[in-house]
Amino acid sequence: MSLSEGQVHRFLDQNPGFADQYFGRKLSPEDVANACEDGCPEGCTSFRELCQVEESAALFELVQDMQENVNMERVVFKILRRLCSILHADRCSLFMYRQRNGVAELATRLFSVQPDSVLEDCLVPPDSEIVFPLDIGVVGHVAQTKKMVNVQDVMECPHFSSFADELTDYVTRNILATPIMNGKDVVAVIMAVNKLDGPCFTSEDEDVFLKYLNFGTLNLKIYHLSYLHNCETRRGQVLLWSANKVFEELTDIERQFHKAFYTVRAYLNCDRYSVGLLDMTKEKEFFDVWPVLMGEAQAYSGPRTPDGREILFYKVIDYILHGKEDIKVIPSPPADHWALASGLPTYVAESGFICNIMNAPADEMFNFQEGPLDDSGWIVKNVLSMPIVNKKEEIVGVATFYNRKDGKPFDEQDEVLMESLTQFLGWSVLNTDTYDKMNKLENRKDIAQDMVLYHVRCDREEIQLILPTRERLGKEPADCEEDELGKILKEVLPGPAKFDIYEFHFSDLECTELELVKCGIQMYYELGVVRKFQIPQEVLVRFLFSVSKGYRRITYHNWRHGFNVAQTMFTLLMTGKLKSYYTDLEAFAMVTAGLCHDIDHRGTNNLYQMKSQNPLAKLHGSSILERHHLEFGKFLLSEETLNIYQNLNRRQHEHVIHLMDIAIIATDLALYFKKRTMFQKIVDESKNYEDRKSWVEYLSLETTRKEIVMAMMMTACDLSAITKPWEVQSKVALLVAAEFWEQGDLERTVLDQQPIPMMDRNKAAELPKLQVGFIDFVCTFVYKEFSRFHEEILPMFDRLQNNRKEWKALADEYEAKVKALEEDQKKETTAKKVGTEICNGGPAPRSSTCRIL
């Protein structure tokens, strides 16, 4: 039976082993040489020897490539291309091992390499990678087991995944794959696909595969170690320069972060990065809580940090490193700022996770912009974001890095480097915190020294002016019984009727400062708190006298003003019937707050403290003077000989201090407009009750509403000079204006700034107009609403209206004079102009009464 040529070809193709043995015996080197153009190497006696010589030459060529070319992809590409020829595989591929977000994966670096392929066609760009998690596909299985795998039929392999086949319209039949190891660590996986001259890869193919890959392994190891060395070098430089800048800048966390991030920008290997700093406030101020409690504002329902803070980026710093370098600092950034709009920084601040996103535009969880962000045409491709955590495990900010410079996604080494930087900076916050605390202590010390130098506590001689125990009893107050002291005070104090302390029209102009101290003591007796709360009477006298001395001798914000505010508070409670809502303890705290509300006032406002860089401005961020008055009042009360709260229990003491906090800070007019609408709603709410008793019962139990009313009472007391009889108000207004003018003089001379009209003594004639504006814009609402709230307070509103008429008349008179003066000046200017024209030969003006015929 004869065989056809085709049958012989098929037999030899299907039996490569037999063909190898047969041609090894039958073919001589001369026969092969005749078939080849290059001839035959000398000394070869068989075909097998000739194959070994060719293989040695190929391996030598690979070694030469490795010596001459440091490019890993190019060397491995040549190895894969030769492997395809030797193994008779359809194609080979290289998968690089990496980790992102703590999850290992394999990504295509060289894909579908064939004997005639070109490197540029097989090199996979970062945005076209095929990525396999280790639990998917044969390559993932190889990376997990770290062993070679020879899959003779992929349909019978449980690990096979057709994912890549579906993407490339290819059919995989068999696979030979092996891991590239560096010690115990996987560096890459190389895979050969589809044996062309047989049904599957053989054991001899496995030997050849491993033999060639020994060289590939060496090259990949060198590449991997070089990359790790580069990463560690960058990491060392980042930490070194960060430490340098951290210890160079200890005063301000923002400047510290900025200097460190800017200095290490060259080592971060990205196009852009953005640092968002978080608000560290854990508890809101009471005036921010009130709108929520009153139902006027929605409670915050957004994301929070792990320690419960609202996520609020108070500043974002953008570092742009591509093209022309630029740094942009955005205070109070809007929600649609490009670095925040995706929601990634907020998510990182909420979860504390490190997020490494390979393909940002395709990410479904975050909303990254797909097109260019700006005119530069820059597009977000891959993102690495991580929290900046301090030593207390609090997230103080979020650092987000965009687009690795080589186009590849950020990997585990990038995560380690960036995390080292953010962790170091987070821990370094301890330095700025410590410095900040030391700075505050230093400021407190300076302020305390100033207080000690200026204020002198009530001494033994001064107390005898009010409590003359030596004259009456021949002994010091400390040696007297409470009944003895009470008897003396009853004789010495003026009584409520003498100076009209129950009246809204009370005036201090006819009183001495000592008489005002006595009236202050009398108010505590009228409230009934001296006996009820066991206030030592010597302590009460010392406290009032010390408070009076605590006020500086300035034009308006002196002891007289402090007493007037307390007296108005007393009158609102007693005469205005507002005490029906408050307990005796609360009334006790409110009058005390009135006495202390402007203690140690400097005669200048909060803005001046900031402009002049006063230590107070460095100590208190907002309501600067009000917080200082509060601290000074507490300072006096902390002294045992002045502590009128000394016999209160712990709960009572906490309550009165809390009320003083609210009452004194509420005198900041900057907060007045925040509480107006809330107070108005309470007044409107009171009109829904038919009888006052039920309303009083309701409001007495509503803590938040009572605090809002109390805060507005403090404003009404602080502005009460505007409601005094005209003969009193006109004089007090001049005192207020004089103090403002003094501040204006300081601004002009010390700060070299032009003061506003209200504080410019050169515009003193405009005082009536300014008073009318102040009454309309600030005062009218307060007293109108209080007169609606309690009709007993109507006299204050009536006198306010009367005073407005008086000021308006003066303002109109001034305006008329100014207008007349302007008209006279205009006529004079016109006359001069006409005279000049006549002198220059021009026509004389016509007379309206005479005519020349």
Curated annotation (Swiss-Prot):
Kindly list the cofactors needed: a divalent metal cation
Class of the enzyme per the UniProt entry, highest EC level: hydrolase
Kindly give the SUPFAM superfamilies that the UniProt entry links to this protein.
GAF domain-like (SSF55781), HD-domain/PDEase-like (SSF109604)
Query: Which annotated residues bind a divalent metal cation 1?
Result: H561, H597, D598, D718
Where Cysteine methyl ester occurs along the chain?
C850
UniProt keywords (A-Z) are: Acetylation, Cell projection, cGMP, Hydrolase, Lipoprotein, Membrane, Metal-binding, Methylation, Prenylation, Repeat, Sensory transduction, Vision
Q: What is this protein called?
A: Rod cGMP-specific 3',5'-cyclic phosphodiesterase subunit beta
Organism field:
Bos taurus (Bovine)
